[in-house]
């Protein structure tokens, strides 16, 4: 859980060497720098953000739903631009924050639109996947490197 991870870091839990969390919980770590170091955010690596994925079976059986899911994400980004106050209220409610508090948290996010997603999957994704696969193989998490070109179906972000 991202909130629990942040809380453990700022509490100084000796059993925690590293944790993955996100805004608004990352803000708690940012506010207490002696508790931990933030290594990377979407400001450093724009595509490190929430992701969604579907199984190949789902994509094959439900291409319209998959396209609608991607288009819905991009519509949400349009709403953030067009009506940020309302957008921050909605998103803040999901993480138990006021709209004003969420607005401050989201200042540390870089929202990736359709064009940025297309750019990422046109090159950066392949490089990242190769580096990740090499590392996972080296440390024994995977036994062989999968077909990296089959990891993402980008037709839904076109």
Go through the PLM ranges and name each one.
Residues 1-11, 24:
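Short helix-initiation/N-cap motifs at beta->coil->alpha
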Residues 11-21, 33-36:
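Alpha-to-beta junction loops
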Residues 23-25, 44, 57:
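Solvent-exposed coil/turn segments that connect beta secondary-structure elements
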Residues 28-42, 102:
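Ligand-binding "clamshell"
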Residues 49-64:
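A bilobed periplasmic-binding-protein/Venus flytrap-type ligand-binding module shared by bacterial periplasmic
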Residues 61-141:
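Secondary-structure end/capping motifs
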Residues 132-158:
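C-terminal solvent-exposed extensions
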């Amino acid at each position: 859980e991202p909130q629990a991870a942040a809380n453990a870091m700022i509490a100084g839990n000796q059993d925690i060497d590293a944790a993955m969390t996100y805004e608004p919980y990352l803000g708690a770590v940012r506010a207490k720098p002696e508790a931990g170091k933030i290594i990377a955010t979407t400001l450093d690596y724009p595509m490190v953000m929430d992701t969604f994925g579907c199984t190949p079976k789902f994509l094959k059986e439900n291409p319209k739903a998959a396209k609608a899911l991607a288009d819905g994400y991009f519509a949400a980004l349009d709403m953030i631009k067009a009506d940020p106050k309302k957008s921050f209220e909605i998103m803040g409610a999901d993480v138990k924050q006021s709209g004003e508090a969420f607005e401050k948290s989201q200042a540390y996010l870089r929202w990736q639109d359709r064009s940025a997603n297309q750019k990422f999957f046109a090159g950066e994704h392949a490089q990242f996947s190769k580096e990740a696969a090499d590392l996972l193989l080296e440390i024994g998490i995977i036994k062989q490197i999968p077909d990296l070109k089959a990891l993402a179906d980008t037709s839904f972000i076109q």
